[in-house]
């Protein structure tokens, strides 16, 4: 494909247009008086969102060079979302201001490399100050942070606070849609562990990049699976039952993984696989815990058990399993509650019997995972559009609250950034010209979140900042008053601000030091089928279907192994393997 090239100031200006295009759409979503963004969908009703990352992902610009700028700032939002779970709009606003100020100075003759160095020096100073201002989160502050992060919705803040209180900060809290009008909190059996799907091709929700299995059967084994020969009998039973299927094994690789992906994507099996957590003996112990939670039998080599002898009765089950790229959450049925309780009591006895502090800690971690359960926040609303909106709000609020527990909080509303901005003045005065300019870019950017919060609430941002400095108080955009934001419970998670700053400086500095931009030249739209007349029947010849190996017809033994030319196992119709005809 032919490429379009853009150089020097021309390329940077085009990239800036893309940055502004996205940032101007995103920044209306910050603060308690934030506005919403409505997004058209080809199928179904439109989405109404107030999440910066979601808005940024939807934007495509016709100019290919400007679109690169749009994608760069979208990367800021998505990276901050991935790392902190919140703060995407703040990161976007910071990036836009840094890019705008940086390009002004480059046009005036400043060195992009020196600006970058100055920005990095300024960032290090800001992060050090931010850490020193951070305070630990406890008690009622948890509800305050959750409420602020939910746009001032006290109901959401209360529900998240209750969930945190019940399952603790290490517990599992899931958000799902409800059939009722009310948003409710439900505590159920379950656990999570730090392992994600073996392949992204198992994802069932492309937008959220997660795999969800409803009422699945679960195979749990401490063996490594590289070929599916031994699993053919149980896969046949699963296919007949129509149940979703999860394989939890020491590892699943090679031909076995390829075959599962093939059958998943062809609709033959609703399947996913996950590697077992931990290592060595602790891995086996963790698998035993999961087996008890799900009512499964652990297929172990130590017990001389082989995969080819597995029956449907050896499998576990769950209400729901949610798998991300690095985490798996199991929501169990209540019928294993007594077994889980007995397992927890056994583990407590093991803690009393060991003198090793390390072993005690590890066993206590297992107890916490088994006994903690899963908190389900069931989101209710009158319409599907409202439900999606509330669900996003709750997820952002939950992530922000977890971040606040991790690294503490600072007074919100941008007040802390304004205070640090003033501190940067002394640093910039002792630096060389271009280095000082880079530091000043950070200084100016730190004021921008407060300006936008004020603007969204109908106030003049410059006036608000001047009053904050004069009164030495924060601005409550909800009430329009200047007050002690810590006492008012308007708090921002330190982790969210830290990551927003780091991500914004990273992308802004890269963009400012860009000299050449290369993008594909869009190809013209192909002519409509059937030629100029638009005859819908034109060009329909050649409806052969080569390359469809692996989709054997029912009863034809379609589950043949690679290279067997369609010679499948008897009765295994429809489940194709690589290399089949």
From Swiss-Prot:
Gly residues bias locations: 531-543
Organism: Prochlorococcus marinus (strain MIT 9215)
Endpoints of the signal sequence: none
Gene Ontology BP annotations: protein refolding
Disulfide bridge positions per record: none
MF terms in GO: ATP binding; ATP-dependent protein folding chaperone; isomerase activity; unfolded protein binding
EC number in record: 5.6.1.7
Name of this protein: Chaperonin GroEL 1
HAMAP family per UniProt: CH60 (MF_00600)
Gene Ontology CC annotations of this record: cytoplasm
Membership in a protein family: Belongs to the chaperonin (HSP60) family.
Subunit structure of this chain's protein: Forms a cylinder of 14 subunits composed of two heptameric rings stacked back-to-back. Interacts with the co-chaperonin GroES.
CDD domains, alphabetized: GroEL
Function: Together with its co-chaperonin GroES, plays an essential role in assisting protein folding. The GroEL-GroES system forms a nano-cage that allows encapsulation of the non-native substrate proteins and provides a physical environment optimized to promote and accelerate protein folding.
Location relative to the cell: Cytoplasm
Lineage, opening ranks: Bacteria, Bacillati, Cyanobacteriota, Cyanophyceae, Synechococcales
Domain of life assignment: Bacteria
Annotated region described as Disordered, given as residue ranges: 522-543
PROSITE patterns found in the cross-reference section: CHAPERONINS_CPN60
InterPro entries for this protein: Chaperonin_Cpn60_CS (IPR018370), Cpn60/GroEL (IPR001844), Cpn60/GroEL/TCP-1 (IPR002423), GroEL-like_apical_dom_sf (IPR027409), GROEL-like_equatorial_sf (IPR027413), TCP-1-like_intermed_sf (IPR027410)
Keywords carried by this UniProt record: ATP-binding, Chaperone, Cytoplasm, Isomerase, Nucleotide-binding
Binding site for ATP: 29-32, 86-90, 413, 492
UniProt cross-references to Gene3D superfamilies, sorted A to Z: GroEL, GroEL-like equatorial domain, TCP-1-like chaperonin intermediate domain
Reaction catalysed by this enzyme: ATP + H2O + a folded polypeptide = ADP + phosphate + an unfolded polypeptide
């Amino acid at each position: 494909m032919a490429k379009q090239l853009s150089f020097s100031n021309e390329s940077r200006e085009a990239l800036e247009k893309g940055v502004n295009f996205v940032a101007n759409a995103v920044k209306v979503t910050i603060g308690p008086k934030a506005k919403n963004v409505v997004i058209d969908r080809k199928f179904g009703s439109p989405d109404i969102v107030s999440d910066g990352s979601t808005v940024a992902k939807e934007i495509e610009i016709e100019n290919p060079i400007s679109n690169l700028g749009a994608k760069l700032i979208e990367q800021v939002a998505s990276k901050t979302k991935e790392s902190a779970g919140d703060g995407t709009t703040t990161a976007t606003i910071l990036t836009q201001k840094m890019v705008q100020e940086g390009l002004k100075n480059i046009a005036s003759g400043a060195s992009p490399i020196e600006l970058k160095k100055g920005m990095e020096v300024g960032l290090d100073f800001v992060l050090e100050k931010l850490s020193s201002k951070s305070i630990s989160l406890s008690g009622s502050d948890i509800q305050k942070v959750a409420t602020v992060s939910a746009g001032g919705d006290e109901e959401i803040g209360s529900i998240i606070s209750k969930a945190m209180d019940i399952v603790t900060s290490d517990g599992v809290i899931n958000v799902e849609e409800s059939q009722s009008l009310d948003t409710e909190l439900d505590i159920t059996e379950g656990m999570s562990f730090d392992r994600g799907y073996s392949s992204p091709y198992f994802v069932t929700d492309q937008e959220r990049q997660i795999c969800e299995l409803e009422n699945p059967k679960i195979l749990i084994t401490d063996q490594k699976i590289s070929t599916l020969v031994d699993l053919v009998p149980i896969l046949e039973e699963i296919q007949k039952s129509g149940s979703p299927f999860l394989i939890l094994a020491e590892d699943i690789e090679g031909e076995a993984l390829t075959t599962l992906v093939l059958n998943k994507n062809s609709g033959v099996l609703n399947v996913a696989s996950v590697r077992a957590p931990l290592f060595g003996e602790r891995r086996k112990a963790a698998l035993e815990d999961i087996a008890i939670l799900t009512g499964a039998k652990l297929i172990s080599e130590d017990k001389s058990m082989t995969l080819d002898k597995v029956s449907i009765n050896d499998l576990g089950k769950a209400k729901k399993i949610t798998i991300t790229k690095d985490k798996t959450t199991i929501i169990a049925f209540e019928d294993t509650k007594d077994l889980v309780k007995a397992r927890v009591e056994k583990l407590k006895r093991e803690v009393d019997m060991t003198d090793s502090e390390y072993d005690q800690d590890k066993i206590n971690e297992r107890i916490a995972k088994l006994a903690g359960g899963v908190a389900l926040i069931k989101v209710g609303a009158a319409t599907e559009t409202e439900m999606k909106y509330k669900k996003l709000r709750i997820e952002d609020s939950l992530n922000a609250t977890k971040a606040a527990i991790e690294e503490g909080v600072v007074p919100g509303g941008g007040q802390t950034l304004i205070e640090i901005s003033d501190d940067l003045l002394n640093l910039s005065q002792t630096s060389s010209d271009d280095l000082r300019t880079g530091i000043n870019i950070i200084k100016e950017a730190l004021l921008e979140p407060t300006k936008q919060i004020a603007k969204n609430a109908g106030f003049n941002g410059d006036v608000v900042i001047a009053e904050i400095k004069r009164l030495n108080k924060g601005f409550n955009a909800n009430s329009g008053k200047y007050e002690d934001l810590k006492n008012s419970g308007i708090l921002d998670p330190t982790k969210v601000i830290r990551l927003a700053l780091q991500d914004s400086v990273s992308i802004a500095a890269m963009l400012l030091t860009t000299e050449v931009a290369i993008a594909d030249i869009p190809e013209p739209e192909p002519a409509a089928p059937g030629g100029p007349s638009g005859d819908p029947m034109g060009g329909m010849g050649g409806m052969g279907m080569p390359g469809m190996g692996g989709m054997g017809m029912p009863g034809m033994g379609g589950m043949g192994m690679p290279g067997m030319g369609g010679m499948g196992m008897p009765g295994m119709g429809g489940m194709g393997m690589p290399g089949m005809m």
